[in-house]
């Protein structure tokens, strides 16, 4: 039935709003919905072709009703596509503002899902190629915007830290970083007592885990 696939996209979008991560892009459903729109548009053209631009809705109500249903179905599919993609871009922008490496996280999610035996074997990222490009350009735009105020971290947390120094455990290797008190090398499973402001971004990005 017309609109069923579009409704599936809306359901995916609704679930996405309640998730901390971005689920895999529904490529096949998106393609099926756009294909349905093209088919409906083709049907409309074929219905109107015999009338040569002189169609009178009141004179042929059966054709008029078919055209209305097709038109409303196309509009609904378009709104479902827009809602699905808007939800995902909002989530992507939120992650960029939080300082997350979105492309790396999406790849890690797919690898974790594949290792658990529930993912698709060919996927390498939960983002579509267009979303990956969008994230790159949005990140560049945000970096240029932040560059105007070098003394203020616009993406920093609005909540003041309760503790100046915290204990952290390294979740994945992050290499050497410079802190106010010197350089430290972050290797997996190591633990440090550091100033929170020096590692807050690494915690957000998933490299470190705050203890206590």
Curated annotation (Swiss-Prot):
Keywords: DNA replication, Nucleus
Protein's cellular compartments: Nucleus
GO-annotated cellular components: GINS complex
Low complexity: bias regions: 113-128
GO biological-process terms attached to the record: DNA strand elongation involved in mitotic DNA replication
Entry-linked Pfam families: PSF1_C, Sld5
CDD domains, sorted: GINS_A_psf1 (cd11710), GINS_B_Psf1 (cd21696)
Transmembrane segments: none
InterPro entries, A to Z: GINS_A, GINS_bundle-like_dom_sf, GINS_Psf1, PSF1_C
The keyword Nucleus is annotated on this UniProt entry: yes
Region (Disordered): 107-131
Protein task: The GINS complex plays an essential role in the initiation of DNA replication.
Family as reported in the entry's similarity comment: Belongs to the GINS1/PSF1 family.
Quaternary state and interactors: Component of the GINS complex which is a heterotetramer of SLD5, PSF1, PSF2 and PSF3.
The protein, known as: DNA replication complex GINS protein PSF1
Organism: Gibberella zeae (strain ATCC MYA-4620 / CBS 123657 / FGSC 9075 / NRRL 31084 / PH-1)
């Amino acid at each position: 039935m017309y609109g069923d696939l579009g409704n599936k996209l809306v359901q995916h979008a609704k679930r996405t709003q309640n998730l901390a991560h971005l689920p895999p892009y529904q490529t096949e459903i998106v393609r099926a919905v756009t294909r349905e729109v093209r088919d409906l548009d083709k049907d409309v053209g074929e219905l109107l072709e015999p009338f040569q631009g002189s169609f009178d809705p009141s004179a042929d109500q059966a054709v008029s009703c078919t055209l209305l249903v097709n038109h409303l179905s196309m509009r609904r599919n378009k709104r479902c596509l827009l809602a699905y993609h808007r939800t995902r871009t909002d989530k992507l922008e939120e992650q960029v503002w939080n300082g997350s490496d979105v492309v790396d996280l999406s790849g890690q999610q797919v690898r974790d899902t594949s290792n658990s035996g529930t993912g698709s074997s060919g996927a390498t990222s939960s983002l579509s190629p267009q979303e990956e490009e969008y994230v790159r350009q949005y990140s560049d735009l945000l970096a240029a915007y932040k560059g105007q105020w070098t003394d203020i971290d616009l993406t920093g947390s609005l909540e003041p830290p309760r503790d100046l120094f915290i204990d952290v455990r390294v979740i994945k290797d992050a290499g050497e970083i410079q802190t106010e008190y010197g350089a430290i090398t972050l290797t997996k499973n190591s633990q440090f007592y550091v100033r929170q402001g020096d590692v807050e971004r690494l915690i957000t990005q998933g490299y470190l885990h705050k203890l206590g």
